[in-house]
Amino acid sequence: MTFVEIKDKITAILSGRAHYYEGYNIQDIVLPTRVLSDLNIKNLIITNAAGGVNSNYSPGDIVALKDHINLTGNNPLIGKNIDELGPRFPDMSEVYNHKFRKIAETVSKDFFDYKEGVYAWFTGPTYETPAEVNFAKTIGADLVGMST
């Protein structure tokens, strides 16, 4: 974790992440996010590579997430509640901040065609089967992947 100042804001930069398919438990995977929360960091910009299942996408497209579908059967909030982390049953209706997505859309206009999509998270490490890709499309996913 590296800290830099960008336009009078302290910014934390993290490189890489643990993946569920590497055998890490879900609590270890979310540890960096919880550290950032303890540091009172309220906003994250996270990137990953994903497979596009939306026929309107092309390889290399940059897509802002508007929602996700967790197909792993795991959730870091399962288990004893940690009150300091927030509510036991958090509202997930606006996980991907609409205001930030609008800013991204505005900024991207001069550089690339802005797209938004829904990400379906699979456990990996195998790539998704054709049936899984079809299922993901059927339930509303635009992207599939195994990144956490």
What are these regions (language model features)?
Residues 30-38, 101-105, 134-137:
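Predominant activation on well-ordered alpha-helical scaffold segments within soluble catalytic domains
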Residues 21, 89, 93, 121-125, ...:
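Glycine- and other small-residue-rich loops at beta-strand/loop junctions that grip anionic moieties
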